[in-house]
């Protein structure tokens, strides 16, 4: 297990959850989501979305991956991967509120020297113009 990086995956949906399981093969991973029901299922070894192959969740948990809905639990991380959906409105404009909210959460636990990676479908400039100032 590589102990140089402790990875926090923010958002355990169809992108973040498989990503967390994959990184858990080599790194310490803490998954964070605001959906407490989802957290309980994952920590119990249940993938109700069928996003990962059979055995992948069990392997990730066995390697020490933990998931939480408590923001303070991700403070020990030094790499944060924000995998939040970006829905669009009726006019196909991106709704950035979930991304802004996730950025605010990460900003509360971010330390000097930490890394933040955004894995969301957004238009060019959003990370620099919207997310970075929030962090």
Question: Where are the model-predicted features located?
Answer:
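Rossmann-like NAD(P)(H) cofactor-binding subdomain of soluble oxidoreductases
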Residues: 88-135
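Short conserved AdoMet
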Residues: 24, 75, 110-111
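N-terminal FAD cofactor-binding segment of flavoenzymes
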Residues: 50
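A structured beta-alpha segment of the ubiquitous adenosine-cofactor-binding alpha/beta core
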Residues: 54-78, 88, 107
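Redox-cofactor binding/interface segments in oxidoreductases and associated redox assembly factors
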Residues: 80-82, 118
């Amino acid at each position: 297990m590589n102990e140089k990086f402790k990875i926090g995956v923010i958002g355990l949906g169809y992108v973040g959850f498989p990503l967390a399981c994959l990184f858990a093969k080599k790194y310490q991973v803490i998954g964070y989501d605001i959906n407490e029901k989802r957290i309980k299922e994952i920590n119990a070894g249940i993938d109700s979305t069928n996003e990962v192959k059979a055995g992948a969740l069990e392997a990730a948990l066995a390697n020490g991956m933990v998931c939480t809905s408590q923001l303070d639990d991700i403070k020990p991380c030094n790499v944060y991967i924000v995998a939040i959906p970006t829905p669009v409105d009726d006019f196909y404009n991106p709704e950035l509120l979930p991304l802004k909210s996730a950025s605010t959460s990460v900003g509360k636990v971010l330390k000097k020297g930490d890394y933040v990676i955004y894995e969301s479908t957004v238009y060019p400039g959003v990370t620099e113009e919207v997310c970075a100032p929030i962090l």
